């Protein structure tokens, strides 16, 4: 698989790997994360599978399903997850901060890379997941777990360094 540097767009090569744990339901699984190094700028990047969010220990599906429940009106304390209430509250705060930022970044990416535009009016009144899904529908189909957060992070981390949901 070929990865381009999200900072400068140059080719990358294998650099290193590390072990990382991820909570999948009530289980803790250890996986190997590959790192690549840019041949242009020398920066290194972790190549995360789409079922892991950057800097998070819970699988993306657990995070997304929990956030969807809360966005649909469920109380934080009643979220269907093994994560603690304080962790869920942190997810909600971060999602509110990053969600619409990601929508804007994806719209810019869609315009710059694919010469496609999404009118702001089409996003008016949508909740964060609705806006993410509307924008993601305009992108080419990719092989993924089909979660909005995972798909958004694939596009963002491959084209824009430092931006993720």
Could you say what each language-model-derived stretch is?
Residues 12-14:
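Short Cys/His-rich micro-motifs in 6-15 aa windows
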Residues 43, 101-165:
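Long C-terminal interaction/binding lobes of large macromolecular proteins
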Residues 70-85:
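Short, charged amphipathic recognition helices of the HTH superfamily
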Residues 82-101:
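Major-groove recognition helix of helix-turn-helix-like DNA-binding domains
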